Each structure stands twice: as structure tokens, then as C-alpha cells.
Amino acid sequence: MSNIEDRVRKIIIEQLGVDEAEVKNEASFVDDLGADSLDTVELVMALEEEFDTEIPDEAAEKITTVQAAIDYVNSASE
């Protein structure tokens, strides 16, 4: 999985224990995928590790959907 979008989706599936079909771009981690605040912190940490980047708290608070995570990683890797 070299594609950023695929890698982000894989992390979300593993961290939240959700089915691949549920991980749509517009899906909210909390409202659609059942994540709680601890899940979202762990998700951000997993993204940081996978993409070897640091996500500041103010940016992490804005990463609330699958697409937001993909967009952030894309912009951080440019």
C-alpha cells in the first residue's frame, strides 16, 4: 500500500476496528465510526508513526473525518 489514501484507510480500519466498507471519505470518526476521544488520539499517533510526521494538537482537533486525515497527510508530505 504505497498510496497515501490506502495507507490512511488501513490505519483507520486497524485503530477503530471497523469494516473497510464503513470507511468512506466523508465518514466522521466519532459520529459514523464510533470512535471516542481516546480512539482519536490513538489514531493521530498511528498516523504520525506511519507517515513519520508530527501533527500539532490544533491540527489534530480538525482531523475529524477520513477525508480530513487524508488531506492532512497529503499536505504534510508535500
From Swiss-Prot:
Which residues are annotated as modified residue O-(pantetheine 4'-phosphoryl)serine in the UniProt record?
37
State what protein this is by name.
Answer: Acyl carrier protein
Q: From which organism does this entry originate? A: Photobacterium profundum (strain SS9)
What is this protein for, i.e. what is its function? Carrier of the growing fatty acid chain in fatty acid biosynthesis.
NCBIfam families, per the entry: acyl_carrier (TIGR00517), PRK00982.1-2 (NF002148), PRK00982.1-3 (NF002149), PRK00982.1-4 (NF002150), PRK00982.1-5 (NF002151)
Q: Which UniProt keywords apply?
A: Cytoplasm, Fatty acid biosynthesis, Fatty acid metabolism, Lipid biosynthesis, Lipid metabolism, Phosphopantetheine, Phosphoprotein
Keyword Phosphoprotein listed: yes
Alphabetized HAMAP family for the sequence: Acyl_carrier (MF_01217)
Q: Explain the post-translational modification.
A: 4'-phosphopantetheine is transferred from CoA to a specific serine of apo-ACP by AcpS. This modification is essential for activity because fatty acids are bound in thioester linkage to the sulfhydryl of the prosthetic group.
Q: Which PANTHER family match?
A: ACYL CARRIER PROTEIN, CARRIER DOMAIN-CONTAINING PROTEIN
